[in-house]
């Protein structure tokens, strides 16, 4: 049976979604892994999103809390809001009380990726505060550390991401993830998928 890795994300302007798509490619490159993209539900009304000039959502399916139980590993992605995950993703996690009660996510590996508006805009604080959500579910946080190699030490150009996970800077919204940031995202997907497969054990395809 294939190891299921869910890439679950919230993206308002598409920056996190671009990272998510690359992460899925990386996870799917691991033999025996089924990598699936999911969006969490939007909490803002359409008229509000329109006033914020938010583009239409992609066709990635909307996940429900109970569907998390079907996965063997996770990579969660979200934009930063004042140094923490966006409220839309927090609202989704707040609805996982039933899974917490039955401990259906305990022992499962999970990684984190993110987007901020600027350097120093909360990439590491967003990751740090998100870890508390994993801890209460008994999940295993899987950082990428410095496994991305030389790409972690890029100094000539602006680059998002950290040992906590892949990331990008959106700026005023016009900046898009760079090739290096997308490369780190692909690496994260591949890295966490391989660990998820290993933790699942011999039952994995």
From Swiss-Prot:
Keywords: Cell membrane, Flavoprotein, FMN, Membrane, NAD, NADP, Nucleotide-binding, Oxidoreductase
Family: Belongs to the WrbA family.
Co-factor: note: Binds 1 FMN per monomer.
Location in or out of the cell: Cell membrane
Broad enzyme group: oxidoreductase
Catalytic activities: a quinone + NADH + H(+) = a quinol + NAD(+); a quinone + NADPH + H(+) = a quinol + NADP(+)
Annotated EC: 1.6.5.2
InterPro entries referenced in this protein's UniProt entry, alphabetically: Flavodoxin/NO_synth, Flavoprotein-like_sf, Flavoprotein_WrbA-like, FMN_Rdtase-like_dom
UniProt KW NAD keyword: yes
Gene Ontology CC annotations of this record: cytosol; plasma membrane; plasmodesma
PANTHER family: FLAVODOXIN-RELATED PROTEIN WRBA-RELATED, NAD(P)H DEHYDROGENASE (QUINONE) FQR1-LIKE 1-RELATED
Chief location: membrane
Required cofactor names: FMN
Protein name: Probable NAD(P)H dehydrogenase (quinone) FQR1-like 1
Keyword RNA-binding annotated: no
Source domain of life: Eukaryota
Binding positions (FMN): 11-15, 112-165
Binding of NAD(+), residues: 13
Function: Catalyzes the transfer of electrons from NADH and NADPH to reduce quinone to the hydroquinone state.
Residue ranges of every copy of the Flavodoxin-like domain listed in the record: 5-192
GO molecular function terms listed in the Swiss-Prot or TrEMBL record: FMN binding; NADH:ubiquinone reductase (non-electrogenic) activity; NADPH dehydrogenase (quinone) activity
């Amino acid at each position: 049976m294939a190891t299921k890795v869910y890439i679950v994300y919230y993206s308002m302007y598409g920056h996190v979604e671009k990272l998510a798509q690359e992460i899925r490619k990386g996870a799917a490159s691991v033999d025996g892994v089924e990598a699936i993209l999911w969006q969490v539900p939007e909490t803002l009304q359409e008229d509000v999103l329109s006033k914020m000039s938010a583009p239409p959502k992609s066709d990635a399916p909307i996940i429900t809390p109970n569907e998390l139980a079907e996965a063997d590993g996770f990579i969660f992605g979200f934009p930063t809001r004042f140094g923490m995950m966006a409220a839309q993703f927090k609202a989704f996690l707040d609805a996982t009380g039933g899974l917490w009660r039955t401990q259906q996510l305990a022992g499962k590996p999970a990684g984190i990726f993110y987007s901020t508006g600027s350097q120093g805009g909360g990439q590491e604080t967003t990751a740090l505060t998100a870890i508390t959500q994993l801890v209460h579910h008994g999940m295993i946080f899987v950082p990428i550390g410095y496994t991305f190699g030389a790409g972690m030490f890029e100094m000539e150009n602006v680059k998002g991401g950290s040992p906590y996970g892949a990331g990008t800077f959106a700026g005023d919204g016009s900046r898009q993830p760079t090739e290096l940031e997308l490369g780190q995202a692909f690496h994260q997907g591949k890295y966490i998928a391989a660990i998820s497969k290993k933790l699942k054990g011999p039952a994995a395809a």
